Swiss-Prot record:
One term under GO cellular component: phenylalanine-tRNA ligase complex
Species, as recorded: Photorhabdus laumondii subsp. laumondii (strain DSM 15139 / CIP 105565 / TT01) (Photorhabdus luminescens subsp. laumondii)
B5 domain residues: 401-476
PANTHER family linked: PHENYLALANINE--TRNA LIGASE BETA SUBUNIT (PTHR10947:SF0), PHENYLALANYL-TRNA SYNTHETASE BETA CHAIN AND LEUCINE-RICH REPEAT-CONTAINING PROTEIN 47 (PTHR10947)
Cofactor: binding details: Binds 2 magnesium ions per tetramer.
Subcellular location(s) per record: Cytoplasm
Taxonomic lineage: Bacteria, Pseudomonadati, Pseudomonadota, Gammaproteobacteria, Enterobacterales
Span of domain tRNA-binding: 39-148
Enzyme Commission number(s) of this protein: 6.1.1.20
Cofactor list: Mg(2+)
Annotated protein name in UniProt: Phenylalanine--tRNA ligase beta subunit
Quaternary structure and interacting proteins, as annotated: Tetramer of two alpha and two beta subunits.
A GO biological process held by the record: phenylalanyl-tRNA aminoacylation
Keywords of the record: Aminoacyl-tRNA synthetase, ATP-binding, Cytoplasm, Ligase, Magnesium, Metal-binding, Nucleotide-binding, Protein biosynthesis, RNA-binding, tRNA-binding
């Protein structure tokens, strides 16, 4: 937005320089993008009047004039401007004047005729780029007055960038309010009084779309002179605001737009049929706009219509059919509040962007319309004459925005700003901003003014106090933090440590969605009911996962479809299990899961291709379990899992408590999920592994160890794990290592049995074991195994 500094100072005039004022405007949140002088540097240019104008005898395009500048004699000046004529008030650069670019005016002869100065155009004075002709000043401009003083050219145009929430500052009054508060000064508003009707003329108005248009005001003004000249002061303010002067009616509505921030529109009353209706556009309805283009209206576009057709696009652009022209005598002046959501995006849809739509999209003061229509009416009558009728007011109060009561707590204010601002000063700032403030204990109750519709929550009030108090007035305080070492128990096992082990073993971490395809999940967990989402992203993401397995297997398929056949992934994340006894009926548990498929090793010329199997995954998992120090207490037991191969899977138990599973994916599931080749998975409850057993340091024996091997035959259904556990119990004092190194079934072993080859490492920390002691320990183990498992030594 652009505006004149002098115009702003008519409303509030702090005793500060232009530079300081610009900095202040920026610091209160209205960023100044640029400041430019209204005119170039020149002097010696005065107001004059052309009293004689004749054709140059020696040039077709030049005129010889005599110009009165209020001195003792008339000046002879040769001029080539096409609009030079008798009686015109002009800007005269007299002899000795210096124009922009250090151009000095001297007496000279042009084609034989003397010229004692120059009649200037706007471009020659650096005021604008208009060089079509010389400046035409009002007929009442006083002769001989310095042009800089008359046009108030010692002024600057300030351009500010307005954030979308500060639509109230798309006007002089909005900027002036903030400047006044920042300088603790009163606002000098112009007196706006109600215009008494001098005619009973009215025009019927009906609002159908009350939600989109809660308030619509109309006023008939008759016998208006549309050919009257817009005052120079108004044209200059418009020009400095970036708006071109068109005619007095448009100029006045644009002036009030810049002054108060309220868009208005004038219809030619004689070109309206019957009545005005504010409604949504009809299907396939068209409207020819003021610029001559035709818009094909969509049904969500708000329009102003008469009894025959749409006559304007509400809040965006007027229609050609009802537009004011040189023949207009009677007008209907419109001033309305359109809801931002009813206007937002519509202008861009039709390739338009107008000052009105820019403001309506962001919001205007819903209580401003009466004030704006009275201001516009008075200016129109002062400039164009006419007779004003009464205001027709169609308002639905229930649809108008209402200001909320907001509580600002002292604790919240101090915490967010980081600086104490006295209570009295906080109250003054809010009051001067237009809020209705009630002071309570340690807080303020504030109702924002109607023009500050962006102030809705407590943080908004904190921002208002901070920016008016001045960010520069908030002292810089170095950031302080107490560096307290986090307590770390030696028994805690870091999840990051586990991830590092898996990465070192060739795995990559995956992060999959907690939302999964319920159909795939049902294949993996047919007996469990999942939590379904009421508003899912899509049908294949409509269930909360019961395990990490669904996401991991889906990721494997995704990679295999992209020629990545060797896949090793792990993931940590929550699973969501419906449980009536859990908080809010959902049990959330952190899980650790993994999956491998493809070759055991990366492809290499010296290695044969070997597919991964159950024991590859078991080895990787045992590397993780080793970190807990509980590996000796963890057992793998044959178990039934519908997602896993019945002969190549196991449940994982910690001291008889189930904590997870491991196994090869069931062949039937491999087919249904389009998995390519054997796929092995595991999943364990992380909270069961998150603590570790701190190892006890023991003295390394200086005495020799002894190895003894035995081969025993046991029934085929006996678990090796149980055999080894019994041996450990027997030889707890001397056996320091037990290892299964061979399993054999076949010739020499009875059917339904298997041969287990077990090695024992025996050692004592205090002495060398005698052969008799070693033999006694081994014999005792064999005896226990015979009794417990019907084992026998193999021949």
């Amino acid at each position: 937005m652009k505006f004149s500094e002098l115009w702003l100072r008519e409303w509030v005039n702090p005793a500060i320089s232009s530079e300081t004022l610009s900095d202040q405007i920026t610091m209160i949140g209205l960023e100044v993008d640029g400041v430019e002088a209204v005119a170039g540097q020149f002097h010696g240019v005065v107001v004059g009047e052309v009293v004689q104008c004749a054709q140059h005898p020696n040039a077709d395009k030049l005129r010889v004039t005599k110009v009165n500048v209020g001195g003792e004699r008339l000046l002879d000046i040769v001029c080539g401007a096409p609009n030079c004529r008798l009686g015109l008030k002009v800007a005269v650069a007299t002899v000795g004047a210096v124009l922009p670019g250090d151009f000095k005016i001297k007496a000279a002869k042009l084609r034989g005729e003397p010229s004692e100065g120059m009649l200037c155009s706007f471009s020659e004075l650096g005021i604008s780029e208009d060089h079509d002709g010389i400046i035409e000043l009002p007929i009442d401009a006083p002769l001989g007055v310095d042009l800089r003083e008359y046009l108030k050219l010692d002024d600057k145009v300030i351009e500010i960038s307005i954030t979308p929430n500060r639509a109230d500052c798309l006007s002089i009054i909005g900027v002036a309010r903030d400047v006044a508060v920042a300088n603790k000064m009163p606002l000098s508003e112009p007196q706006i009084e109600a215009v008494k009707p001098t005619t009973d003329a009215i025009f019927p108005i009906r609002v159908e779309a009350t939600e989109a248009c809660p308030r619509y005001l109309g006023r008939v003004i008759k016998n208006i002179n549309v050919k009257a000249a817009t005052p120079q002061w108004m044209r200059e303010k418009l020009r400095r605001g970036g708006i071109r002067s068109i005619d007095p009616i448009v100029d006045v509505t644009n002036y009030v737009l810049l002054e108060l921030g309220q868009p208005l529109h004038a219809f030619d009353l004689e070109r309206l049929n019957g009545s005005i209706t504010v409604r949504m556009a009809k299907q396939d309805e068209k409207l020819v706009l003021l610029d001559g283009t035709e818009a094909n209206l969509s049904t969500d576009t708000l329009v102003i219509s008469d009894e025959k057709q749409a006559v304007a696009m509400a809040g965006i652009f007027g229609g050609e059919h009802s537009g004011v022209n040189e023949e207009t005598q009677n007008i209907l002046l419109e001033c309305a509040f359109f809801a931002p959501l009813a206007i937002a995006g519509r202008a861009r849809r039709y390739g338009l962007h107008t000052d009105a739509s820019h403001r309506y999209e962001r919001g205007v003061d819903p209580q401003l319309q009466h004030k704006a229509i009275e201001r516009t009416t008075q200016l129109l009558i002062d400039i164009c004459g006419g007779e004003a009728g009464p205001i027709i007011d169609v308002t639905d109060e229930s649809q108008l925005p209402q200001s909320a009561t907001i509580t600002l707590r002292r604790e919240k204010l101090d915490r967010l700003i980081g600086h104490y601002i006295p209570d009295e000063q906080v109250g003054d700032i809010l009051t001067h901003l237009g809020c209705k403030v009630t002071i309570q204990e340690n807080c303020w109750q504030a109702v924002a003014p109607s023009w500050r519709f962006d102030v809705e929550i407590e943080e908004d009030l904190v921002e208002e106090v901070a920016r008016i108090y001045g960010y520069n007035n908030i002292p810089d305080v170095p950031i302080r933090a107490d560096l307290i070492m986090k307590k770390h128990r030696e028994t805690d096992l870091s999840l990051q440590r586990v991830k590092t082990v898996l990465v070192d073993r060739g795995y990559q971490e995956a992060i999959t969605y907690s939302f999964v395809d319920p159909k795939i999940q049902a294949l993996l967990h047919p007996q469990q009911q999942a939590l379904m989402l009421p508003n899912p992203i899509s049908a294949d993401m409509s269930a909360m996962r019961l395990s990490l397995l669904t996401g991991l297997l889906t990721t494997v398929v995704y990679n295999q479809n992209r020629q990545q056949n060797r896949v090793r992934l792990f993931e940590t994340g929550l699973r969501f299990v419906p449980d009536e006894n859990a908080d809010q009926g959902i049990r959330q548990e952190l899980m650790l899961g993994g999956v491998i498929t493809g070759n055991r090793f990366e492809e290499h010329w010296s290695l044969e291709k070997q597919s991964v199997d159950f024991f590859d995954m078991k080895g990787d998992l045992e590397a993780v379990l080793e970190l807990t120090g509980k590996l000796s207490k963890i057992s793998f037991r044959a178990d039934v899992n519908p997602a896993l191969h019945p002969g190549q899977s196991a449940g994982i138990y910690l001291e008889n408590e189930y904590i997870g599973y491991i196994g090869v994916v069931h062949p039937e599931l491999e087919r249904k999920l389009d998995l390519n080749g054997r796929t092995v998975v595991f999943e364990v409850l992380w909270n069961k592994l998150a603590s570790r057993v701190v190892p006890d340091a023991k003295e390394i024996s200086r005495f020799p160890s002894n190895r003894r091997d035995i081969a025993i035959v046991v029934p085929e259904n006996v678990a090796v794990e149980d055999v080894l556990a019994e041996c450990k119990k027997v030889g707890v004092n001397h056996i320091v290592g037990i290892n299964l190194f061979d399993v054999y079934c076949g010739k020499g072993v009875a059917e339904g049995h298997k041969s287990l080859a077990i090695s024992f490492i025996l050692q004592d920390t205090a002495r060398t074991l005698e052969e008799e002691e070693i033999a006694a320990t081994i014999n005792k183990c064999v005896a226990v195994l015979k009794q417990r498992f019907q084992a026998s030594l193999r021949d």
